[in-house]
């Protein structure tokens, strides 16, 4: 479990009526899968979100997250969305361009639609950091935090 002052305080909010969408990239699935699982388990176990109210979709990569989320919320009603991707820095500037564009794109989709979009984007320097932040190798699973954030922001949007 996470310890230290960094990170959100635990939330005891309950959202059994919430409809949540998770859209994840298919790049770096070894880290993506536990992040998605952590978000889902946290929403169900800690916040009483019903499994049947959680939809999970995928897009090719993190670049496509904003577009995929925008298309999904245009077709269906959701109270909150989590966009999950993992970007691992390489030897070119590609990492910087993609990470900045995705962050801005996710914020824009949330502001334009009125549906809270949780930033579930890990931007890391290597695979080891990605796995650690996905709760593997003794690390804290950031998907847990994103699940709690989706419930809190979904409730804010609903009420």
UniProtKB/Swiss-Prot annotation:
MF terms in GO: 6,7-dimethyl-8-ribityllumazine synthase activity; riboflavin binding; riboflavin synthase activity
Residues the entry annotates as binding (2S)-2-hydroxy-3-oxobutyl phosphate: 91-92, 133
GO-annotated biological processes: riboflavin biosynthetic process
Pathway the protein contributes to: Cofactor biosynthesis; riboflavin biosynthesis; riboflavin from 2-hydroxy-3-oxobutyl phosphate and 5-amino-6-(D-ribitylamino)uracil: step 1/2
Catalytic activity, reaction form: (2S)-2-hydroxy-3-oxobutyl phosphate + 5-amino-6-(D-ribitylamino)uracil = 6,7-dimethyl-8-(1-D-ribityl)lumazine + phosphate + 2 H2O + H(+)
InterPro entries named in the record: LS, LS/RS, LS/RS_sf
Sorted UniProt keywords: Riboflavin biosynthesis, Transferase
Keyword check for Transferase: yes
Stated consequence of mutating residue 27 to G/H/I/S: Reduced affinity for riboflavin and for the substrate 5-amino-6-(D-ribitylamino)uracil
Keyword Transferase included in the entry's annotation: yes
Catalytic residues (UniProt): 94
GO cellular component: cytoplasm; mitochondrial intermembrane space; nucleus; riboflavin synthase complex
The EC number(s) this enzyme carries: 2.5.1.78
Pfam family, one: DMRL_synthase
Activity control, per UniProt: Competitively inhibited by riboflavin (Ki of 17 uM).
Binding residues annotated for 5-amino-6-(D-ribitylamino)uracil, in chain numbering: 27, 62-64, 86-88, 119
Highest taxon of the lineage: Eukaryota
Subunit-level organization: Homopentamer.
Protein purpose: Catalyzes the formation of 6,7-dimethyl-8-ribityllumazine by condensation of 5-amino-6-(D-ribitylamino)uracil with 3,4-dihydroxy-2-butanone 4-phosphate. This is the penultimate step in the biosynthesis of riboflavin. Also binds riboflavin with an unexpected high affinity.
NCBIfam families: lumazine-synth (TIGR00114)
Family: Belongs to the DMRL synthase family.
Protein name, entry field: 6,7-dimethyl-8-ribityllumazine synthase
Gene designation: rib4
